[in-house]
Amino acid sequence: LFARGVARRYALWRSGRPQARFDRPLLRLRGLLVEVFGGRRQLRDPLAGSAHLLILYGFCAELVATSLISIQDWSGVHFLEGRFYLGYSLFADLFGIAGLIGVGMAAWRRAFLRPAHLHTVFDDWLALALLGLVFAQGFAIEGVRIAVTELEAQPGLALWSPGGYAVAVLLRPLPDATLLLLHRTLWWVHALTAFGFIGYVAYGKLEHIAYGLANVFTRNLA
């Protein structure tokens, strides 16, 4: 679905007149990083901008964290160990918490503050729900794992994952067999949610994740 959506948008772009929009790639990349991660435009509205940046940083950090796990599993090279693993765990959890806070701020703004210029439709709530689910499911899976493998056997290690640790404390009274079944179930639910999220990005409210980056990179530098 994602590839199909991107292909359709690319065909639309190709229908226009050709222009040089890939020249000076380093300048374009620098502008992209400043615009996206600096949040200059978004922070004109402090609450909306802060929520956007928290979600962005949280999402990017979780993407990096998940990618590192995948690289380790596929390569067979175990580099998530020792102090690096502790830092990695803390980094992933803190940014995941930041992402959840950002989703909460955005939802609060739409549900209760309701600025006059802000028009909320179903797609807005769907986007926030998907983002919140992706973050929350990650903590749920981590919490189940910690409850089984670290909470009692390695409590010092578990503390480096504060979000997962909080979930683990709540779940620890459950039998190990129940926790293992819950872990497998949550893993598949999370995988389906993540793939659904990726497909949704090409069509829904979050399409700016893909197309906004392309638009900023290929902006007119004249």
Where do the protein language model's features map onto the residues?
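Membrane-embedded alpha-helical bundles of multi-pass integral membrane proteins
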Residues: 1-222
